[in-house]
Each structure stands twice: as structure tokens, then as C-alpha cells.
Amino acid sequence: MRFLIIIPAHNEEDSILLCLNSLAKQTYQNFNCIIVNDGSTDKTKELVENFIKKNTSFRLKNLDTSFHQPGAKVVQTFYQGLEEVSLADYDVICKFDADIIFPPQYLENINKVYKENPKTGMVSGLVYIQNDKGEWVYENLSSKYHVRGPIKSYRKDCFFAMNGLRSVLGWDNIDVMLAQMNSYDIITIKNLWVKHLRPTAYKYKSQKAEKLGEYFYNIGLNLPLAMVSSAKSSFKNRSFSEFFITMKSFLSQNKPLQLTQEEIKFIRNLRNPLQKILNKQ
């Protein structure tokens, strides 16, 4: 299977070569990689330009000025990379972050899963970060069964079936739900992990509750489901005020949704606590 790898990059001079070198050393080499330099003001562009001179499977696309925003912007940058190729030439589409170091057998293992199960729509390993002791530990932001945003891969047929990625906050959860909606399996390889050099969304921790409200809106939750989801998060984080911040953010949203009514219905059903109980009967 042939892989297309898109790497959005914004001011990644400290990590970009570590990422690219780890891909250049993959045991599975049937891939092309496009680095999309999203208006970097550091040495990212120069570093990648020098790298691609010696690595013909890699190419660079430069964009002009950028604004840094979680979620929506990275998807828009990703699509700039897709425009550079004909997807007819590829079987698997990947969106990788520029601050990831991949083990040499990463793509080989991903390819094996796709080949063995035609209904597998998304595959990844796990994401590890370095703790204060210098140890590499699991980045415990989500379930180990979730294909994380920094290391997304999609079977092309699945990518088309779910109409691609949505350029909104929460895109990296929406894609999983839409893959499930289209009857594709989601696989994570538990003994295959990558090194994440910079913890996810580290710049946005202070805005977590506000972003959660925006996310609930983006996935089409109605008011009762948003309240239940906000309450669960608030209880988990032991923060009474978080509930009100999240709901205020949810109620303030008014932009058009990027989901169809059919997709919204599926997601609401998926997240409905009562429906989950009924499904277990």
C-alpha cells in the first residue's frame, strides 16, 4: 500500500529534522511526504529545504502568514498539502505532527494492519511523552483505543466515505466518530509508540473549559447532552466552575456546523448515556 504523509509545520525548528529523519529511516519506504510550512518565522523552511535535497520522497510547500489556532488551522494546512498530489496514487493518507519521532518499523506495522483487515479505516500507535525524570510515558489524554491527532492515518476509502476532515476544533474526535458511522474499524497498536516532543495543546490549557464548550457545539450536541457532558467533565476535574464556563462557551457559539443532520444524529446517539445502556442490553 502506498502512503501519503502530510506534515503541517509552524515554527518547528527544534523538532522538524528529528521527525523527518525518523521517517527517512522507516523500514517501509513506499510513501511520499509533503511538509507544509505554515508561515514559520524561524528556521523551519531552511532546515526542510536542505533536508529534501537529499531525500527525494519528501517535498516542501510554503504558505504565507499564519495564525496559530488549535484544531481548525491544522486541518486547513493539511488540505494545502493534499492539493499537491493526486490521491488516486495513494492508498493511505496520514496527518502527522512535526514534533513526533517515529520508531523504524512504524509504517511497516501500520501497513500490515491495513492489509490484513479491509474494514480498518484508521490505524495508529500510541503517543508517549517524556516526564520530569526523563522517562517516556504514555500521554494520558485519551483512551489507548483512540487514534490521536498527532499520528492520524486513514484508509483512503474511509477518508472519502466520511467526506474528509472538518476544519473545526475537535476534528480529531469527529473523524473517529464518522469513521465508525461508515462501519470502519479503528485500530491502535498498543506495543507501537512514538515520541511526542511537545505535549498536546500545551499552550491552551488555560482555555480548556471554553474549548470544551466549543467542541460540544461543533459535534452537534443538543442542550441536554451538552449539560450532561459538561457535568461529567466538571466532576472528573473536581471543578464546579468548569461546568458554567463550558456551558457559557457552548451557548455563545453561533457559527454554521460542518456536520450533516445524519452525522449529528449519529454522534448524539453515540454520546447519549441512555442509548449506551440500551446498547449493552
Where are these regions (language model features)?
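Short beta-strand-to-loop acidic/aromatic patch adjacent to the donor-nucleotide binding site
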Residues: 89-101
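Conserved donor NDP-sugar-binding/catalytic core segment of glycosyltransferases
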Residues: 101-137
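Short, acidic, metal-binding catalytic loop of nucleotide-sugar glycosyltransferases
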Residues: 21-30
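A short, conserved alpha-helix in the catalytic core of glycosyltransferases
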Residues: 158-161, 168-197
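Conserved nucleotide-sugar donor-binding
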Residues: 148-163
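Conserved donor nucleotide-binding strand/loop of the catalytic core
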Residues: 46-88
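Non-catalytic, C-terminal membrane-associated alpha-helical segments of glycosyltransferases
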Residues: 208-281
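A conserved acidic beta->alpha catalytic loop
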Residues: 37-46, 65, 100
